[in-house]
């Protein structure tokens, strides 16, 4: 049981090791507010998670998603979302990262328009990380955040990025907090504490409580968030519509309901984002037993692959028809300081990616490293001199269900690609279990999505008749095990002694093998991994 100075609401228990900042995060009024939201909405969260499972059974039986006939009137109707607040009309470059103190300061200072402060995929949800993240964002909102490290001081500069925290997805619990004997929703926990402590302060400073919403699978899941927003604002006396949220379209099923998601959130919408890596993961996950579905090496599946191109263009068209921001996807590259040729090759990839997004009509884009902000900004400044390009309507874009489901390329699947999946999986899960969810791997800043693709591809290649390497060998459990053992031996020399000592790479490899060799597919690797951390 938590050693807390705060009286808990009836039915609530907190079972976690006390961390220094939690007494100012978990105040009595904040916890009461959290409990009220959880009691009001937890039954619906569970119903929606059950709907996900039922829908997966239909996909396993061969059904494919389609545009919903019952919501045709919404798709064909002439309506717009509520206008955007002044401070988020221009979002040309957004930086993403976890909520540790140094990252928050550097991200807010880096020249980006906004900072997606991540409680989700770039974060390992230890109790300490969740509590410190909330305290760090509260200090950032008030402009008081500072940090000292190795004789260097960090503090906020003059103009800072606008904050967009990302709470956890509907599938994740906050295991340290139970209400009436059951864990509370991780997403409601993250949202409620941030909103309670910061909404009025943000509004007083000319900004507002803005959020990114991950992993939605339907407009009904968007409706749940909208109802939470409406109740939260009413409870605290915050004007209705103050909350604005950008939904990451990062599941194949949500791509069929983009209009409906904007409609459900229209008082609270800040548009949609092209969540490319989780989107690929979702495609593999949803059609994992479909014998016709099998994607090539992860490196071959890019934003120019036909099904990815269709999804991105449909998102831009859908958003702009509703006067909503259409945000481009992540550039995960990290500047390579000791190899100018490799660095130039990486940066040229970033430039090509951002030029495509800007000319497609995106209103901004994501980067994972401050060093990429000037590159992305220069491109959007060139193609988008105005704050956004909502006016770029894209009447030329006509995307069908068939286009969204045209999953190519299927080849090549190579041993090198499989080894890369395994090595990335070992490194990411090993770091995550050590408390770090944002991990530099092979000059890319990776979050959970890349590890999800990696293990899902191998799981499917083992089971699909199309899971055959370019040299003719079938991918099997035995081949996977052989590669895993070999790659684990290489990990210490790749990550370095210091990182290897702080990570849990052997445990990570074991978990990677368990979930990949298992006959039943694990929906999210972070679910079993969460049980292994404090």
Predicted regions and their residues:
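Expand to "…catalyze enediolate/carbanion chemistry for C-C bond making/breaking, isomerization
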Residues: 2-534
């Amino acid at each position: 049981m938590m050693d807390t100075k705060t009286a808990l609401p009836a039915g609530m228990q907190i079972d976690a090791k006390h961390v220094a900042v939690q007494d100012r995060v978990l105040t009595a009024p904040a916890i009461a507010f959290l409990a009220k939201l959880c009691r009001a909405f937890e039954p619906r969260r569970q119903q929606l998670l059950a709907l996900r499972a039922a829908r997966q059974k239909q996909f396993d039986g061969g059904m494919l998603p389609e545009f919903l006939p019952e919501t045709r009137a919404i798709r064909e109707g002439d309506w717009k979302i509520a206008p955007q607040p002044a401070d988020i009309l221009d979002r040309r470059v957004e930086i993403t990262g976890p909520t540790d103190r140094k990252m928050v300061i550097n991200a807010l200072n880096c020249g980006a328009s906004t900072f997606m402060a991540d409680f989700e995929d770039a974060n390992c949800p230890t109790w300490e990380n969740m509590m410190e993240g909330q305290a760090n964002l509260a200090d950032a909102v008030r402009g008081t955040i500072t940090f000292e490290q190795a004789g260097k001081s960090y503090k906020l500069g003059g103009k800072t990025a606008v904050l967009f925290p990302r709470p956890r997805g509907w599938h994740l619990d906050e295991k340290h907090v139970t209400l009436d004997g059951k864990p509370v929703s991780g997403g409601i926990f993250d949202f409620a504490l941030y909103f309670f402590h910061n909404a009025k302060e943000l509004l007083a400073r000319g900004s507002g409580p803005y959020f990114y919403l991950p992993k939605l699978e339907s407009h009904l899941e968007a409706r749940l968030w909208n109802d939470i927003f409406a109740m939260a604002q009413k409870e605290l006396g915050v004007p209705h519509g103050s909350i604005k949220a950008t939904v990451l379209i990062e599941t194949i099923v949500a791509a069929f309901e983009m209009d409906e998601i904007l409609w459900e959130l229209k008082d609270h919408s800040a548009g949609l984002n092209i969540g490319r890596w989780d989107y690929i993961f979702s495609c593999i996950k949803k059609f994992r037993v479909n014998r016709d579905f099998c994607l090539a090496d992860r490196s071959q599946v890019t934003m120019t692959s036909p099904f990815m191109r269709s999804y991105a263009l449909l998102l831009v068209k859908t958003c702009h028809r509703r006067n909503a921001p259409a945000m481009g996807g992540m550039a995960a590259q990290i500047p390579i300081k000791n190899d100018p040729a490799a660095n130039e090759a990486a940066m040229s990839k970033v430039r090509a990616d951002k030029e495509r997004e800007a000319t497609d009509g995106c209103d901004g884009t994501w980067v994972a490293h401050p060093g990429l902000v000037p590159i992305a900004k220069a491109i959007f400044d060139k193609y988008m001199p105005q704050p956004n390009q909502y006016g770029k309507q894209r009447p030329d874009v006509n995307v069908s269900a068939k286009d969204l489901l045209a999953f190519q390329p299927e080849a090549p699947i190579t041993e090198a690609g499989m080894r890369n999946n395994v090595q990335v999986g070992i490194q990411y899960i090993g770091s995550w279990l050590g408390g770090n969810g944002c991990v530099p791997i092979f000059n890319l800043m990776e979050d959970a999505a890349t590890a999800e693709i990696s293990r899902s591809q191998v799981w499917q290649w083992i089971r699909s008749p199309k899971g055959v390497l370019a040299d003719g060998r079938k991918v099997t459990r035995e081949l996977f095990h052989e590669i895993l053992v070999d790659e684990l031996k290489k990990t210490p020399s790749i990550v370095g002694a210091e990182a290897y000592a702080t990570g849990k790479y052997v445990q990570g490899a074991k978990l990677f093998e368990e979930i990949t060799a298992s006959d039943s597919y694990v929906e999210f690797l972070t679910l079993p991994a969460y049980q292994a951390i404090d």
